[in-house]
Design a protein with these regions (language model features):
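A domain-level signal for caspase-like cysteine endopeptidase catalytic cores
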Residues: 1-73
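Active-site or metal-binding loop neighborhoods of secreted/extracellular toxin and effector enzymes
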Residues: 1-22, 34, 113-118, 127, ...
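Second-shell loop/turn segments in exported
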Residues: 31-37, 128-133, 230-234
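Low-complexity, serine/threonine/proline/glycine-rich extracellular segments that form mucin-like
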Residues: 74-78
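Catalytic cores of nucleophile-dependent amide-cleaving enzymes
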Residues: 80-166
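Compact disulfide-stabilized, cysteine-rich extracellular microdomains and processed peptide cores
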Residues: 193-253
Length: 253
């Protein structure tokens, strides 16, 4: 029993720094034992993303390990956090390749409230959180509900190839994830912490024909549109990049 308890304690605290960045970005990835197809190996694409974010990349085996790492970060210090691991819409898998199917300490499950609360305390205002996992969109509202200060949670409802995940600069000055999928089978969607409220913006006529009437319908493609060309501005000169929470704007309550 003592050996078993010691092993569990080790697994809970096991982490490994893969790359050290000088920015305010943190990426959690699983250990190779929980990565059956090497999706989270540090290949050229992953290293390029880490360089762009100036991110520290840490491999974790348990929620406890991720929590221990976050606990050492200063409050309000992280502008970007990626939670990477295989998924099926119910959790982000870390673990050892076996336990994460049912053990709630091995992967990031919706009821990991202590971890999400700790994460919220470490984020800056309007931080970006990426669920870097297949089929993770159902988790995004749950994660966003636990956050504050206009944090944006990005996720997709499909499975995707990691080489298609790229970061682009949005109008708020943040690097946000996009999926450049040549088959257009997946896209990143965004859910915002509940304390952010949209400012008035009425979409121009050409956008309304595409089903976008205001901030509630905005997609990241609209957020990334250039306000300077006037194509997304309303009659009052307001654009989504300065009005909509999904675009990193809006009013914080």
């Amino acid at each position: 029993l003592a050996v078993r308890n010691a092993l569990i304690a080790y697994q809970d605290n096991a982490w490994m720094v893969v790359t050290t960045g000088k920015g305010s970005a943190l990426v959690f990835y699983p250990f190779p034992a929980a990565d059956h197809n090497d999706a989270y190996s540090l290949d050229d694409d992953a290293r390029q993303r880490a360089r762009e974010l100036a991110a520290t990349v840490v491999r974790v085996g348990r929620v406890g390990a991720a929590s221990n790492w976050l606990a050492h970060a200063s409050p309000n210090s992280l502008r970007h956090v990626s939670l990477g691991g295989h998924g099926n819409g119910t959790r982000v898998m870390w673990g050892d390749g076996r336990c994460h199917e049912s053990d709630r300490t091995c992967g990031l499950w919706p009821n990991n409230k202590a971890f999400l609360s700790l994460l919220a305390s470490r984020l800056t205002e309007r931080a970006v959180v990426v669920l870097e996992s297949c089929y993770a969109l159902p988790l995004a509202p749950i994660v966003a509900e636990s956050l504050r200060d206009g944090a944006r949670v990005f996720a997709t409802d499909a499975c995707y190839n990691q080489e298609h995940l790229k970061y682009v600069l949005d109008a708020s000055g943040d690097l946000v994830p996009m999926l450049f999928d040549p088959w257009h089978t997946s896209s990143m969607q965004v859910v915002v912490a509940p304390d952010c409220h949209d400012m008035p913006w009425v979409a121009p006529e050409w956008l309304r024909t595409l089903g976008v009437t205001g901030c509630a319908d905005v997609t990241m493609d609209v957020c990334l549109s250039d306000d300077a060309d006037g194509e997304v501005l309303d009659r009052k000169g307001q654009g989504p990049a300065s009005a909509c929470c999904r675009c990193g704007a809006g009013r914080l309550m």
